[in-house]
Amino acid sequence: MQTDTFKDKVVIVTGGANGIGRCISDEFRNQGAIVYVIDKQEGEHYVGDISKKEVLEAFAIEVLSKHNKVDVIVNNALPLMKGIDECSYEEFQYALSVGVTASFYLVKLFMSHLADGASIINISSSRDRMS
């Protein structure tokens, strides 16, 4: 159902090309938001690996060149993880870069542009290993 609950609100969603992130992005759009997705997967959104500082900086410049405020940041991107016995040090470091460092840095980049009453939503789940 389409409403205008978030009409003209600027929303950022990491990992918004598929799954939960895609549903979140679609729902915000259905409620009138202007949604910016960043994802590693090719598509009609900003494509980039958020584990890289320069990618996050370029994304922030892109968003802020069009809007001077951000109302919602949804940190949703997380790489698939293996169990501790199968996960290499490098894979774990990458997971930390995407799931922790990128979330911190993205908020830091937009901090002075957050609208009054802005929301920061951090999503974490291990459900993919339970289904």
Locations of the language-model features?
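Canonical Rossmann dinucleotide-binding motif of NAD(H)/NADP(H)-dependent dehydrogenases/reductases
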Residues: 4-35
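Conserved catalytic-site loops of classical short-chain dehydrogenases/reductases
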Residues: 71-72, 93, 118-123
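Conserved NAD(P)H cofactor-binding loop of Rossmann-fold oxidoreductase domains
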Residues: 76-81
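Catalytic loop of short-chain dehydrogenase/reductase
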Residues: 121-131
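A short, exposed helix-loop element centered on a Lys and neighboring polar residues
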Residues: 107-108
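Rossmann-fold cofactor-recognition segment
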Residues: 40-54
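Substrate-binding pocket helix/loop in short-chain dehydrogenase/reductase
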Residues: 83-93
